[in-house]
């Protein structure tokens, strides 16, 4: 059963306006930056020497996400690997990839990912598989 498995979720467009999300999923280390809508903001957790940062990009304020990443990486400097998840597919090639809010997120967040040594970015929204070069 799903209740016996650990699950790390990222808020998407179908969950963002529904208060039930926060009742079904545990989100540790939740930030308190900005508006953060009904379901909450970005959060993080560590597993071994991996830092997972889950961005609620339903909030398109990139400055808040960047501030969260900066603070989180500083608090977890001992983690060897850094993984970011977000719902919007900012690196994909499907139909949403050229929407203004997706393009803005891509241009704002990519330099931050590079600056803080993010090893992997996992996305969803377009329901299409794509990947970058081998890292």
Regions found by a protein language model. Name each.
Residues 1-78, 100-101, 108, 130-135:
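Extended active-site neighborhood of metal-dependent phosphoesterases/phosphodiesterases
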Residues 79-121:
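Active-site-proximal segments of metal-dependent phosphoesterases and phosphodiesterases across multiple
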């Amino acid at each position: 059963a799903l209740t016996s498995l650990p699950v790390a979720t990222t808020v998407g467009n179908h969950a963002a306006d529904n208060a039930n999300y926060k009742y079904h999923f545990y989100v540790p280390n939740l930030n308190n930056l900005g508006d953060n809508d009904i379901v909450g903001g970005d959060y993080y957790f560590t597993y071994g020497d991996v830092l997972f940062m889950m961005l609620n990009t339903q909030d398109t304020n990139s400055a808040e996400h960047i501030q969260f990443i900066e603070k989180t990486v500083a608090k977890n400097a001992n983690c060897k690997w850094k993984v970011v998840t977000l719902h919007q597919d900012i690196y994909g090639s499907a139909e949403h990839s050229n929407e203004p809010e997706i393009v803005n997120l891509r241009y704002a967040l990519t330099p931050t990912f590079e600056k803080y040594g993010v090893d992997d970015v996992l996305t969803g929204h377009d329901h299409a598989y794509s990947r970058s070069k081998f890292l």
